């Protein structure tokens, strides 16, 4: 949520999904999941009692989600991402230009990756030894997902 510079990535493309899920970022560390749909879809697909959950309605989780959404708006997180993301893009593009084994930068906002010609496990391990945390996405992509704030 917010990582691409919009609250949800679909907002970059001029479409509105009929159904969407949200989870991890919605709780900012508190386990939560949400299944959202338009009223039009809900009217045609769900009746009372069709969709239930063991933990649904938990007040603690509800309060956490409320605070996360409040913080996202209050602290202008999406605007901040739009402001700082070009720096990450520029630096990753510079790395791709500098090293032949890097073939391209992918992603948007503060969810970026660089594609490598070979598996990246050793690179991620060496980066960690040097104090840089990167994760892999598949066998040949280094993913960079810095904090939103």
Describe every region a protein language model picked out:
Residues 1-149:
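Conserved N-terminal phosphate-binding loop of PLP-dependent enzymes in the Aspartate aminotransferase
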